[in-house]
């Protein structure tokens, strides 16, 4: 029997298929190896730093440098990042800048070659050496430090690096672009330091809106763990205990010419621990409005009013997202004006803002008619080292509160020396409010 000879081209095709199969397996293995290398390559690195989401806090012994390096470098499409200082700690030795990928974590950013950083404690720029040059102002809790690379730098491989403070450019410097890119870095060097990292931050254009933001910032006399962005206030504190209060106090007290203000709850955050009220000028920054002497406030989370005490009285329903809380003063006709030159010439006609136009009964409540109304006696807590200010008949007023344009209640109070300042407190993460310090006109 004659054997049939298998065609040669069939054997060749099978060999080609086998080679293709092995090439495919090698290709898959190579892809897996590349992914593993990239996964290892793009990992955030840190030492003596505790990382909790986007929050970084110092976690070393005194004298040890803490350093954090982000997992990916800045790019042409993502060329800017920011760091918000939550707590400046003991010395405020916080550094923000750019470093090579494998930068030594035992040194502050900017101390070693091919790195640059803006240091908060002295306002100096450190560019590859342990000695800095004067660059900008010092930074404290509540400040934001930004760092970026001009987009054109990615085409010429020479990095033009700029820094910002609270959204405003401080200055710039030039350094060679590292082959692997320049990575966002944060350094810390003392106990208690804590920051919030914003790797996807965007730098707004410096136009008329920035000038408007500046004018709004000027309206605030004190800001603690609160960020101002136009009319918006954002809580920046830890929100972990009752002393982590974020406080915003207006620069000027309420007067017969400006006796009312409003707050809209934009974001209630985790707990809606938002308080609106009035307080003396030297009110403690770590006490919620209403908790300590010389203050009275309406709290959104429980609908209670607090008047110089940590125990509140039932007042009205709670407030939620979108609600507008208001606070004002009804002045008696015989009110004794402070030396600020307050006058009641323009206060006979009061018109509410559109958001509270339904509250027509607020229109003429600036003056309190004294017709035998009984004054409630409020017991005020005496804080350590402070004396209760004696009541003065000519400085007794009625503080009133509104909810969505309607008066919901009143509280008798004595105006402290210097006046009652609009004060807003926040105490849980994510809280944001929109403030109108001058909702009335006329």
Swiss-Prot record:
Species this protein is from: Pongo abelii (Sumatran orangutan)
Segments forming domain B30.2/SPRY: 17-204
Stretches the record annotates as Disordered: 371-394
Underlying gene: SPRYD3
SUPFAM superfamilies membership: Concanavalin A-like lectins/glucanases
PROSITE patterns per the UniProt record, alphabetical: B302_SPRY
Cross-referenced InterPro entries: B30.2/SPRY (IPR001870), B30.2/SPRY_sf (IPR043136), ConA-like_dom_sf (IPR013320), SPRY_dom (IPR003877), SPRYD3_SPRY (IPR035783), Ubq-SigPath_Reg (IPR050618)
Composition bias, Acidic residues: 372-390
Name of the featured protein: SPRY domain-containing protein 3
């Amino acid at each position: 029997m004659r054997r049939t000879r298998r065609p040669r081209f069939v054997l060749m095709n099978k060999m080609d298929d086998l080679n293709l199969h092995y090439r495919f397996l090698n290709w898959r293995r190579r892809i897996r190896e590349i992914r593993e290398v990239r996964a290892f390559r793009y990992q955030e690195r840190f030492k003596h730093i505790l990382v909790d989401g986007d929050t970084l806090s110092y976690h070393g012994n005194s004298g040890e440098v803490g350093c954090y390096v982000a997992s990916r470098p800045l790019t042409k499409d993502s060329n800017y990042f920011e760091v918000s200082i939550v707590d400046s700690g003991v010395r405020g030795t916080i550094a923000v800048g750019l470093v090579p990928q494998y930068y030594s974590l035992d040194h502050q950013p900017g101390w070693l070659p091919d790195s640059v950083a803006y240091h908060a404690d002295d306002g100096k720029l450190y560019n590859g050496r342990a000695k800095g040059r004067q660059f900008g102002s010092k930074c404290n809790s509540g400040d934001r430090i930004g760092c970026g690379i001009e987009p054109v730098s990615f085409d010429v491989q020479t990095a033009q690096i700029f820094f910002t403070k609270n959204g405003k450019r401080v200055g710039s410097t030039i350094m060679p672009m590292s082959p692997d890119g320049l990575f966002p870095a944060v350094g810390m060097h003392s106990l208690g330091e804590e920051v919030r990292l914003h790797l996807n931050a965007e730098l707004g254009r410096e136009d008329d809106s920035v000038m408007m933001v500046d004018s709004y910032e000027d309206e605030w006399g004190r800001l603690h763990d609160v960020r101002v962005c136009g009319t918006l206030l954002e809580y920046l504190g830890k929100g972990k205990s009752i002393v982590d209060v974020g406080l915003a106090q207006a620069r000027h007290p309420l007067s017969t010419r400006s006796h009312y203000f409003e707050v809209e709850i934009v974001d209630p955050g985790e707990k809606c621990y938002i308080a609106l009220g009035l307080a003396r000028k030297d009110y403690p920054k770590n006490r919620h409005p209403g908790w300590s002497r010389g203050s009275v406030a309406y709290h959104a989370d429980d609908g209670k009013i607090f008047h110089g005490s940590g125990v509140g009285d039932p007042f009205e329903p709670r407030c939620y997202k979108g609600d507008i809380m208001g606070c004002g003063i009804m002045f008696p006709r015989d009110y004794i004006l402070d030396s600020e030159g307050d006058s009641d010439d323009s206060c006979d006609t009061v018109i509410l803002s559109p958001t509270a136009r339904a509250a027509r009964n607020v229109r003429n409540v600036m003056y309190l008619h004294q017709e035998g109304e009984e004054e409630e006696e409020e017991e005020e807590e005496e804080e350590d080292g402070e004396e209760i200010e004696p009541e003065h008949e000519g400085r007794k007023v009625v503080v009133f509160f509104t909810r969505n344009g309607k008066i919901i209640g009143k509280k008798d109070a004595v105006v402290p020396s210097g006046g009652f300042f609009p004060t807003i407190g926040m105490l849980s993460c994510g809280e944001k409010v929109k403030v109108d310090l001058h909702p009335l006109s006329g």
